[in-house]
Amino acid sequence: MKLDILGLKTLSVLKQAFEYIKDRHGVVLTMETIPLDDAPTYNIFLNKNTAGIFQMEESLMTEYASRCMPKSLIEISNVISLVRPGPLGIEGCLDGYAKSCSGESPADFPFPEYNYIFKETYGYLVYQEQLSRLSIDMCGFTGPESDELRKACAKKNRDALLSLRDKFIDGAVKKGHGRDDVANLFDSMEEFSRYSFCLAHKIVASVSND
């Protein structure tokens, strides 16, 4: 078992805020009862009022969140995960996601038959779990093989990732996909591996801090 434990003051601030709200307004709030569809909360990102919000205070993050106009917890998580070295290095990734998220352009993965894997990220590879699922469905990887690919990205192990290149491409070609198209996809994955998030980790962080 791997435990990722973060000692964040933000959690103490939230606890204190709950106590203040109860004392002053008689309203009892907990992490479990806070509504996740509260429009004024999402307007904070739209209006760039992100001072004091963990991971959202940087100017680039603030501007990008306002542009994407997140309307759900997963969309906040997507924004935080995209403004990272991996996605930032993929040409057109951030701009494309913002346009798809806001409805300006179609939300399509380069291989549309796998859109179901990328529905919540508007056609873009954002999380390690998506890569694992894609390697199984598109390339015929086994579960352990897909996890090997995920770990290569999680640990930023370029050599381990490249060792799976031929298997990834050959597996996709066997399912009828063009070799050059799949090779281009793998190249973008290599950039993605510079810094990518596990969805479970990111959602927990989003719930705790955002």
Question: Where do the model's predicted regions map?
Answer:
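Mg2+-dependent phosphoryl-transfer active-site scaffold
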Residues: M1-D210
